[in-house]
Amino acid sequence: MKKWFFLLISLPVIIISCSKGDESACGFSDSGASASAVEISYIQNYLSANSLTATQHSSGLFYTIDDPGTTNTAAICSNVTVNYTGSLMANGVVFDSNNSGAGISFVLGQLMVGWQKGLPLIKNGGRITLYIPPSLGYGAYDRTDNNGVVVIPGNSYLKFSIHLRDVQ
């Protein structure tokens, strides 16, 4: 009898502890970061000088949606698969890209704030161009390659062309 009682008490605890939690349990939350007025002005001047039109997000990120996509919008805990090209707005130098095959996958919450704010603006299959100020990008610190060569100087403004291939 004691064994059955123990089993009846233990079973719900085991089931609850093994059940899938909600998305808030993923460990990531929405960042409240936003661009400064100086950063916003820089991007506005860049867009104007290059005859580009973009929409300003409430965070100070600017974007153009080339294709809105059709299904599944990314959330902070979503696994996203993308193809992308990242370049420096100052000189157009491409510092990173992944445009081959099925793309590369990340948890959105692991990425820079600019991507966290921008990718949910499109759906699965969509394409977006993001103009990201330093405060929503890599910040004040240099980013180096595997050889220690600086590929993204601190306080860089970044442009990413992104194809959101899949959202899970």
At which residue positions do the language-model features occur?
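Sec-dependent bacterial lipoprotein signal peptides
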Residues: 1-18
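Cross-family detector of peptidyl-prolyl cis-trans isomerase
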Residues: 5, 18-168
